[in-house]
């Protein structure tokens, strides 16, 4: 049954839907799981992925469906809602369907954007658990990451306080001689805390640590989160963690978690994190939640492990990429699928009339502020101009060889004439297009959308990567900039050029993925520029090295690894009932 999403808040819909949500033992029977494959945690459960994959190794994979979007407004365009709506629509068509989504960060949940639990009748439940820590994965990652920082700062203190002979006699450790000006790692916390971007630590005496500048980043930007998204099993996870570069010594040599003898203990914190959590749509389709890296500063995907499990357990598996096709889909295409060896059947491009109007020259959209009337009343001229961004993204998807399906995530203020413009432009660009009212009506509102995806899945495709791994780093970046972003070329800073030359000449980085770091609010590096800008070049100021995740991250423009909390954050409206413990105000 569909709830009245125009009168009920998301948390209220979740509360009602949870009354009939399958419990772990019911999911076990429904999904055909063995008892030992389900690790119950209250009314949620984790799945022992290795046991499931081994048991179902000979079973053919289901259809692999990715969901992306056009360049969004700061409000987001409903990719999670669309992903869940598609699961519900396919379920309403009688299909065996499930999906995989990322775990939300506490930062955006308590800030402006909200939980990423979907919305209306296309919602992930139970919403409170999803929004407030779930089964502890992000907490495990914070503990593991910060243990690495504890190991490094303690080592620096002891090496300062003891000479070589004392260090060997008292601790059995060799001197690492870490350069305090070349520490790559910082501390992490799962909030948007701009006051922690630049800090000084170790104030006090010789037993109070090592005095130096330091920093905090948001937890989901941690390399450990990126590793969780791409790891294949616990052994792979442990190896990658040990390879993380935490700093450089005074001779310029990398210092890793293995050098600090802390990598194995960090992996121990994540022994259960490796298993995905099973949740439910509001219409009771299964959905795995696993990993939660940001897309503009990391890989922006749910885990490879979750996709491998889902493709074995159901016939249609839906997964979401962060932000727009230029960022999230590009990383799904050239990084996630390259690492996993999985080939998708369809990519869904989520579009809203609101975002298209913004790209057509509409007034500025500001999170937390009321929308201008241009976005809530018919304006065909803005839509007509704005569809160029959608057409560009369709072209990006088609370069991969995947069949694109445009989903018009329809709001109740959109008009038929506006939607007709979008459909005409999408079909002219070679994509199927369907409108969907899943927010309002759940699966019944997504039938046209589900049918388009089913049809697209039955067609063959010629999926291939944008570039071979043999291509040099700077050539890869140039290809991404020109063919995905629409740039005229790339301008490298002297520092970035020197680092790129070093990386290109060192064979150990030859198989590292290229992970672009760029704003999600524009095809360019400048978040102000909307639509499909022409006559611009992409500046690369630095290249970050994630030696554990095996990413090389060229940075376009300035991106902070620690977002800030805005002036009207969501936490002001979140409350808990002392009598029942029920949480209200989440969205």
From Swiss-Prot:
Q: In which pathway does it act?
A: One-carbon metabolism; tetrahydrofolate interconversion
Q: Which UniProt keywords apply?
A: ATP-binding, Ligase, Nucleotide-binding, One-carbon metabolism
**Alphabetized CDD domains for the sequence:** FTHFS (cd00477)
Q: Which InterPro entries match?
A: Formate_THF_ligase, P-loop_NTPase
Report the EC code(s) recorded for this entry. Answer: 6.3.4.3
Q: Which domain of life is it from?
A: Bacteria
Q: Where does ATP bind?
A: 73-80
Instruction: List membrane-spanning regions.
Output: none
What GO terms in the biological process aspect are recorded for it?
tetrahydrofolate interconversion
Q: Cross-referenced Gene3D superfamilies, in alphabetical order?
A: Domain 2, N(10)-formyltetrahydrofolate synthetase (3.30.1510.10), Formyltetrahydrofolate synthetase, domain 3 (3.10.410.10), P-loop containing nucleotide triphosphate hydrolases (3.40.50.300)
Which protein family is it in?
Answer: Belongs to the formate--tetrahydrofolate ligase family.
Query: EC class of this enzyme?
Result: ligase
- Encoding gene per record: fhs
Molecular function as annotated in GO = ATP binding; formate-tetrahydrofolate ligase activity
What is the protein name given in its UniProt record? Formate--tetrahydrofolate ligase
Source organism per UniProt: Desulfosudis oleivorans (strain DSM 6200 / JCM 39069 / Hxd3) (Desulfococcus oleovorans)
Q: Which reaction does it catalyse?
A: (6S)-5,6,7,8-tetrahydrofolate + formate + ATP = (6R)-10-formyltetrahydrofolate + ADP + phosphate
């Amino acid at each position: 049954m569909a709830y009245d999403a125009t009168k009920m808040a998301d948390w209220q819909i979740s509360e009602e839907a949870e009354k009939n949500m399958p419990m772990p033992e019911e999911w076990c029977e429904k999904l055909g799981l063995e008892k030992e494959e389900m690790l119950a945690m209250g009314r949620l459960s984790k799945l022992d992925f290795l046991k499931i994959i081994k048991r179902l190794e000979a079973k053919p994979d289901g259809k692999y469906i990715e969901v992306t979007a056009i360049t969004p407004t700061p409000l987001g365009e409903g990719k999670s809602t669309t992903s869940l709506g598609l699961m519900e629509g396919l379920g309403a068509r009688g299909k065996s369907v499930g999906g995989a989504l990322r775990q939300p960060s506490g930062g955006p949940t308590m800030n402006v954007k909200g939980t990423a639990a979907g919305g209306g009748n296309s919602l992930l439940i139970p919403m409170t658990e999803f929004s407030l820590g779930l089964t502890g994965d992000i907490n495990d990652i914070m503990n593991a990451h910060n243990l690495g920082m504890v190991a490094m700062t303690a080592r620096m203190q002891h090496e300062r306080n003891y000479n070589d002979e004392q260090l060997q006699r008292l601790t059995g450790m060799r001197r690492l001689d870490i350069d305090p000006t070349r520490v790559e790692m910082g501390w992490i916390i799962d909030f948007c805390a701009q006051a922690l971007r630049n800090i000084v630590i170790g104030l006090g005496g010789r037993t109070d640590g090592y005095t130096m500048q330091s920093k905090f980043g948001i937890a989901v930007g941690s390399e450990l989160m990126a590793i969780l998204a791409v790891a294949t099993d616990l052994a792979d996870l442990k190896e990658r963690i040990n390879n993380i570069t935490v700093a450089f010594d005074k001779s310029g040599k990398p210092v890793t978690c293995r050098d600090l003898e802390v990598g194995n203990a960090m992996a121990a914190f994540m022994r259960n994190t490796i298993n995905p959590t099973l949740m439910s749509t509001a219409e009771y389709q299964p959905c795995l939640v696993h990993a939660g890296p940001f897309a503009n500063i990391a890989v922006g995907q749910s885990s490879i492990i979750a996709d491998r499990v889902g493709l074995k357990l159901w016939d249609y598996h839906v997964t979401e990429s962060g932000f727009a096709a230029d960022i999230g889909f590009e990383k799904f295409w050239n990084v996630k699928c390259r690492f996993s060896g999985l080939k998708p059947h369809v990519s869904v491009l989520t579009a809203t009339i609101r975002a298209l109007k913004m790209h057509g020259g509409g007034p500025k959209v500001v999170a937390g502020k009321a929308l201008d009337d241009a976005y809530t009343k018919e304006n065909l001229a803005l839509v007509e101009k704005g569809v160029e961004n959608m057409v560009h993204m369709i072209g990006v998807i088609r370069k991969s060889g995947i069949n694109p399906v445009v989903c018009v995530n329809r709001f109740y203020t959109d008009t038929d004439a506006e939607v007709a413009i979008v459909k005409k432009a999408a079909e002219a660009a070679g994509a199927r297009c369907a409108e969907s009212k899943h927010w309002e009506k759940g699966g019944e509102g997504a039938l046209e959308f589900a049918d388009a995806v089913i049809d697209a899945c039955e067609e063959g495709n010629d999926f291939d990567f944008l570039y071979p791994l043999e291509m040099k780093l700077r050539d890869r970046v140039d290809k991404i900039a020109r063919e995905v972003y629409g740039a005229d070329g790339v301008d490298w800073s002297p520092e970035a050029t020197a680092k790129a030359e070093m990386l290109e000449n060192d064979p150990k980085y030859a198989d590292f993925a290229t992970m672009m770091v760029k704003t999600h609010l524009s095809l360019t590096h400048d978040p102000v520029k909307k639509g499909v800008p022409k006559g611009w070049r992409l500046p690369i100021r630095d290249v970050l090295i994630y030696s554990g995740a095996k990413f090389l991250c060229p940075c376009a423009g300035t991106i902070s690894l620690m977002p800030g909390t805005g002036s009207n954050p969501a936490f002001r409206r979140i409350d808990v009932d002392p009598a029942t413990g029920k949480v209200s105000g989440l969205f």
